């Protein structure tokens, strides 16, 4: 069996905007869960989430940004870090033997709701041509392939919270099968109330720790009462 190794990492998350920051936060046991006032105003049971302190509009060229929802923009920044970490040249990135498999747990619900509201208030012609690459379930891989001129395999896997793990595993198998020499793999999610409300309605998210959000994430604790939604890309 062909041995596969990880040569570069890139992360944008609630505990850091790059690998170094995330590593430090993990060593310090830092929580990225915070109170979200909007969720309280909307009447959500769960009023906490993993938020980001990052202005993607300042970091992504607007010509690329117009095609991206926030999740795809996070992915773009994480991939930029991974490329630098791996020391890949432009020709190695944009190469027939280089591919990308990266996804998200669902579509960009905020963009879908926005398009619906625009259609209702102003008509369908006002929706604009950039909403599809922002909203579709394959927005992450599509935007990465376009921005970095990926010439090899490019697609998304969507499998809820397992999306990133499945994408990474699929990338490993792709290289083992000889279909590619290099693969970018991972997953990303943006945070928007239009998606959060679905999980809140299910009662799947933590609501006991709204006043102490840093204590909400307790995956293996007997007192856990649900997960915390968040935005990130790895």
Report the location of each language-model feature.
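Residues that mark the start of a beta-strand
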Residues: 3, 97-99
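A glycine- and small-residue-enriched flexible loop/hinge segment at structural boundaries
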Residues: 38-88, 102, 137-151
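ACP-dependent fatty acid/polyketide chain-elongation machinery
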Residues: 1-64, 86
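Glycine-rich beta-strand-to-loop/alpha-helix junction loops that act as flexible
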Residues: 7-9, 102-105
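Generic hydrophobic secondary-structure packing signal
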Residues: 21, 25, 71-78, 137, ...
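Acyl-thioester C-C bond-transforming condensing/cleaving domain
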Residues: 17, 28-32, 36, 84-96, ...
């Amino acid at each position: 069996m062909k041995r596969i190794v990880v040569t570069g990492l890139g992360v944008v998350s609630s505990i850091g905007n790059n690998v170094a920051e995330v590593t430090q936060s993990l060593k310090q046991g830092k929580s990225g869960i915070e109170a979200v006032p909007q969720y309280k105003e909307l009447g959500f049971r769960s009023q906490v989430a993993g938020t980001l302190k990052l202005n993607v509009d300042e970091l992504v060229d607007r010509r690329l940004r117009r095609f991206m929802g926030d999740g795809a923009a996070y992915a773009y920044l994480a991939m930029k870090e991974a490329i630098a970490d791996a020391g890949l040249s432009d020709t190695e990135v944009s190469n027939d033997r280089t591919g990308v498999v990266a996804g998200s747990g669902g579509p960009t619900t905020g963009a879908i709701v926005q398009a619906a509201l625009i259609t209702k208030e102003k008509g369908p012609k006002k929706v604009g041509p950039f909403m599809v690459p922002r909203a579709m379930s394959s927005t992450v891989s599509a935007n990465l392939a376009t921005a970095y001129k990926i010439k090899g395999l490019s697609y998304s896997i969507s499998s809820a919270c397992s999306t990133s793990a499945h994408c990474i595993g699929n990338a490993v198998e792709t290289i083992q099968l000889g279909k590619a020499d290099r693969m970018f793999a991972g997953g990303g999610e943006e945070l928007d109330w239009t998606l959060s409300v679905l999980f809140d309605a299910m009662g799947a998210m933590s609501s006991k720790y709204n006043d102490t959000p840093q204590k909400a994430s307790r995956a293996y604790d007997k007192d856990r009462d649900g997960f915390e939604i968040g935005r990130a890309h790895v």
